[in-house]
Structures are given as C-alpha cells and as structure tokens.
Amino acid sequence: MIEKVNPSHPDKIADRIAGAIVDLAYQVQPDPKIAVEVLIGHGVCHVIVETSAPLLMPEAVRAIHNAIRRIAGLIQIDLTIVPQDAHLANNQSEGFRCGDNGIFKGIPLTDEQKTLAAIARDIYAAHPFDGKYILDDSRLIICQSNATWADIEKLYPTAEINPLGDWTGGTDVDTGATNRKLGSDMADSVTGGGLHGKDLSKADVSVNIYAFLKAQETGKPVELCCAIGDDTIDGKPYEEIVEIARHHIQSVGGFEAFAEWGLY
C-alpha cells in the first residue's frame, strides 16, 4: 500500500518553494548552509530562512519573491531571513560534517511503489493540478483536481475516481507545509528527518539520498545513524556521501526539481 502526491499538492508547493530558495543560495555561495521552512495557504506564503548565504541582498530577495510567485502564483509573501546559528556554523568550518543527529533508512522500492509513481506522473502530465493517488494491491484510488471523472476514467477505467465528486484543490483549499509528504517522497525509507529546504551538509538530505540509492543498488535494506559532527558514515568520509547526494540532486535538475517527486 502506497500513497503518492503530485508536484501541485499544497505540501509539494511548499517543498518546491523551499527547494528553489536552496537553489538560489547555491547560486550566490559555494556550499552554503541553509534551512528553509515554508507554510503556504489562502493567499499567504510564510517563509523562514536560516542561512550563511547573502540572501538579504536586494537582488536575492527579489529572486526569492520571483521564485515563490512562479511556483505559487500571485500571493502575499511573509519572508524572514536570519543568519545560521554560530555553533552550527562552527561545526562545518573545517569541512563537511553531519549537520545534525539522525537515523536513516534505505529500502528497495516495491513493484507497487514503482507502479504508483508511474501512474502519478502519467496523470500529472495530462492534468498538472493538485492530486493524490493510492495503490493498495489491485485497488487504485485517484483524487485529481480540475479533472472530470470521465477525463480520468479514460486513462484508468478500473480506478476509484474522485469519490466525493469533482474538486478544485490547491492552496486556496488546503494549506501546505515543508516536509509533510515524506511517505510520498521516500516510500518505506521514511525515518526521522525531511529531505527538502536544506543544503547538502544536512544529513537529512545527503544520508537519506545515499541510503536510498544504496538500497536500490544492492536490493537490501540499509540502516544508518549519525551524531552531529560525525565525519564518517557507513565507513565512508562524509564528504564522499555529500558528493554522491550532490550528483543525484544535479541529475534531477536541482533542489526545486528534486522536491517535485522526492526520491522516486
């Protein structure tokens, strides 16, 4: 049994905004330290950014506003940008070290999970609006906004479609928050921390990506943990794990693109 939401779900809009701001930080500073939280809904987008990057420059603030409105439309923006905590910054002063305590798990994807991921992308390609999908053995449930029953029935005639009828969805119907759809992003690999709105020094990003990729490659579960400040994980220098995660983020098009669908 698995649930998947698409990139226009309010929670994913929040993740995408957070990812876009992380992308901007990487444009203005090599390997910035950044954490972004987004709460969006009903015409307002609240954003808090903790960062080492110079994002208070007028051109950077404009770029953040432009990214938010590109993703979420015309919306009131409440933006707070503050420096990273000095103790946390000192942890990374001499190279990459784990940015927090954490537990991590990578689990090979099941055929059911791969199937639903493909279905979600297929529907979203035709209907790029808020949607949520569930697959439980042979039972497929499709809740897709801004589409009629007949539209979806043509694609998936045996599915349960919009059980309460047609709907509009989006951030004027439901609020969105960063890292609230980790089951959709990570399947059975969910543990403690979220993937989005963070730089690569954060173990929640790099170790989660590393564990997931290793599980898919080996076909075996992977379980890891770290303490803040660790410089070795799974017998590898943490810097090497960061570079594996960096390559994955780059391969999908950046942090905003990564936030669209998560790990699969």
Predicted feature locations:
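A domain-level signal for the structural core that forms small-molecule/cofactor-binding pockets
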Residues: 1-264
